[in-house]
Amino acid sequence: MSKTLSFKTYSAKPGEVKRTWHIIDAENQVLGRMAAQIANVLRGKHKPQFTPHIDTGDFVVVTNAAKVALSGKKRDDKTYFSHSHYPGGVRIDSVKDLLQKKPEKVIEHAVWGMLPHNNLGRQLFKKLKVYAGPEHPHAAQMPVEMKINQ
């Protein structure tokens, strides 16, 4: 008798997932390209065990967020719009101001836009750690350096 082939789709279980820590130096990295790769690692799309409805991704630490590069004239022209839901509660922040005050928010905003906007996306987003300078408190996790494809 011949062996029968199994055509069952593999679905990862939350307990089976092996998570690693990655570190990215954002200095002179283009924001959008870097954010796309970070989102893929957070989701786990770089692993063969990727399952869309399960958190199979890894942790990502981003350093030097204040030195991120923006292509074109985005550093001067790009703005972020938010509203407090009160009359006159419009708030418009430019990237230039945010990079001076809270440079972490620029990378977090870009990555959040590339993750699913549901409970799973919020869970994935918690695995992103962004720091303005080169120091980070995650040395004990032994993060692996990750290169960004340009």
From Swiss-Prot:
<dbReference type="InterPro" id="IPR005822">
    <property type="entry name" value="Ribosomal_uL13"/>
</dbReference>
<dbReference type="GO" id="GO:0003729">
    <property type="term" value="F:mRNA binding"/>
</dbReference>
<keyword id="KW-0689">Ribosomal protein</keyword>
<comment type="function">
    <text>This protein is one of the early assembly proteins of the 50S ribosomal subunit, although it is not seen to bind rRNA by itself. It is important during the early stages of 50S assembly.</text>
</comment>
<dbReference type="GO" id="GO:0003735">
    <property type="term" value="F:structural constituent of ribosome"/>
</dbReference>
<dbReference type="GO" id="GO:0017148">
    <property type="term" value="P:negative regulation of translation"/>
</dbReference>
<dbReference type="GO" id="GO:0022625">
    <property type="term" value="C:cytosolic large ribosomal subunit"/>
</dbReference>
<dbReference type="InterPro" id="IPR005823">
    <property type="entry name" value="Ribosomal_uL13_bac-type"/>
</dbReference>
<dbReference type="Pfam" id="PF00572">
    <property type="entry name" value="Ribosomal_L13"/>
</dbReference>
<protein>
    <recommendedName>
        <fullName>Large ribosomal subunit protein uL13</fullName>
    </recommendedName>
</protein>
<keyword id="KW-0687">Ribonucleoprotein</keyword>
<comment type="subunit">
    <text>Part of the 50S ribosomal subunit.</text>
</comment>
<dbReference type="InterPro" id="IPR036899">
    <property type="entry name" value="Ribosomal_uL13_sf"/>
</dbReference>
<dbReference type="GO" id="GO:0006412">
    <property type="term" value="P:translation"/>
</dbReference>
<comment type="similarity">
    <text>Belongs to the universal ribosomal protein uL13 family.</text>
</comment>
